């Protein structure tokens, strides 16, 4: 993880997953839209009051504060966002950071004093492969069934968070 070959991200569901850095782009393209929808629903239901303008502003601020290989903890990022005038209690910060992950702005950085950090994905993994959707779905299914067999199609759908129609 320190070197960035393995990343910790919300990649298949709104749950932390460890993935190979070279897989991040195609996996994000498969799952980002659903994770953002779940994230938005949760934010709305919990009164976070976030909109697309907030997410865009946060992403721009993250690009500035994490640029140049700067890896910061959540607490440090919260402080920087607050200094820039954004309200960032824990629920809002969770939603903002998950959205930035699914937009491909941030990913896990190198731990600092035993605490996880965030870094810019473009700096941490500048050359990640992207795949057409059909190829990405086939690769995801192949990897799942090789590592989780015996397993059923329903197991794969649950694990991946994919809609049944897309998983077929």
Language-model segments: residues:
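Long, low-complexity intrinsically disordered regions
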Residues: 1-168
């Amino acid at each position: 993880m320190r070197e960035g070959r393995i990343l910790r991200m919300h990649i298949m569901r709104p749950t932390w997953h460890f993935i190979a850095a070279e897989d991040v782009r195609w996996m994000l393209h498969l799952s980002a839209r659903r994770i953002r929808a779940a994230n938005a629903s949760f934010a709305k239901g919990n009164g976070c009051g976030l909109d697309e303008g907030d997410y865009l502003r946060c992403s721009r601020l993250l690009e500035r504060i994490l640029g140049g290989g700067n890896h910061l903890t959540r607490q440090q990022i919260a402080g920087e966002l607050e200094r820039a005038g954004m309200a960032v209690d824990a629920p809002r910060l969770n939603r903002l950071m998950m959205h930035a992950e699914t937009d491909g702005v941030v990913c896990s950085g190198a731990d600092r004093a035993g605490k996880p950090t965030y870094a810019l994905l473009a700096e941490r993994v500048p050359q990640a492969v992207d795949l057409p959707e059909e190829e990405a779905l086939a690769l995801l299914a192949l990897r799942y069934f090789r590592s989780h067999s015996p397993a059923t199609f329903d197991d794969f759908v649950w694990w991946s968070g994919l809609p049944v129609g897309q998983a077929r």
